């Protein structure tokens, strides 16, 4: 039995479009430019909209009768609309039982439609508040994550500083050479007489002195590593 194929929740992007946005085309500046912003009007779901239209248009501009006053409490009006929808729905059921062909059936349908339009309109007026609240919560989550990351980093930093301080405190003032450390020759070196070679003598002496200093530093570092481990 083969492995189950993963199905994407979104449709596959059109290949004739995405193939133009390769890394090479983007690097060479050959990728298509984004479309220009719409300035006048646009079509959406078969309706024409103006760019300067309000996000939530008043009911009067849509030719819909307003059932609630201009100044109102959204919570109270939503509850009133919910109760009105319930009462009209029960009336609709009673009409369908007693006289299905009555003209009152169409009237109740229009009443229910108007009530639902008002309820959706009042809910949509909460969308800007919902967007601001969602953004606020998202920023609070990001802030909390960054503070937690900074706190963990500070703890690791303090731990590293403490380890370094403990290592420095454990080091003696006079570092002795361990048994496995590199031994340094203490015998005097044979230095040629200046009369035999005027140029090689000082250079060889300087090189030997530098080598001896390097060996001392290497030996001290070996001692430090041995004590840490």
Curated annotation (Swiss-Prot):
Keywords: Activator, Nucleus, Transcription, Transcription regulation. GO terms for cellular component: mediator complex. The keyword Transcription applies. It comes from the Eukaryota. It is found in: Nucleus. GO terms for molecular function: transcription coregulator activity. InterPro entries: Immune_Mod/Transcr_Coactivator, Med7/Med21-like, Mediatior_Med7, Mediatior_Med7_sf. Its main location: nucleus. GO terms for biological process: regulation of transcription by RNA polymerase II. Component of the Mediator complex. PANTHER family: MEDIATOR OF RNA POLYMERASE II TRANSCRIPTION SUBUNIT 7, T-CELL IMMUNOGLOBULIN AND MUCIN DOMAIN CONTAINING TIM. Component of the Mediator complex, a coactivator involved in the regulated transcription of nearly all RNA polymerase II-dependent genes. Mediator functions as a bridge to convey information from gene-specific regulatory proteins to the basal RNA polymerase II transcription machinery. Mediator is recruited to promoters by direct interactions with regulatory proteins and serves as a scaffold for the assembly of a functional preinitiation complex with RNA polymerase II and the general transcription factors. Belongs to the Mediator complex subunit 7 family. This is Mediator of RNA polymerase II transcription subunit 7. The lineage of its organism: Eukaryota, Metazoa, Chordata, Craniata, Vertebrata.
């Amino acid at each position: 039995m083969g492995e189950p194929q993963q199905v994407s929740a979104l449709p596959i992007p059109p290949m004739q479009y995405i193939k133009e946005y390769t890394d090479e085309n983007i690097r060479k500046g050959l990728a298509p430019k984004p479309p220009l912003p719409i300035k006048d009007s646009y079509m959406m779901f078969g309706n024409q909209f103006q760019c300067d239209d309000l996000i939530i248009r008043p009911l009067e501009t849509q030719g819909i009768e307003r059932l609630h006053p201009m100044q109102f409490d959204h919570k109270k009006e939503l509850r009133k609309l919910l109760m009105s929808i319930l009462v009209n729905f029960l009336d609709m059921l009673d009409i369908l039982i007693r006289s299905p062909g009555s003209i009152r059936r169409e009237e109740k349908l229009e009443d229910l439609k108007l009530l639902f339009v008002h309820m959706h309109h009042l809910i949509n007026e909460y969308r800007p508040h919902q967007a601001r609240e969602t953004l606020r919560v998202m920023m609070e989550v990001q802030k909390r994550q960054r503070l937690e990351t900074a706190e963990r980093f500070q703890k690791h930093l303090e731990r590293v500083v403490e380890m370094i301080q403990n290592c420095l405190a454990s080091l003696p003032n006079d570092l002795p050479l361990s048994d496995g450390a590199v031994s340094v020759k203490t015998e005097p070196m044979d230095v040629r007489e200046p009369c035999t070679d005027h140029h090689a003598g000082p250079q060889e002496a300087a090189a030997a002195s530098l080598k001896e200093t390097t060996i001392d530093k290497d030996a001290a570092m070996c001692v430090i590593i041995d004590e840490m481990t």
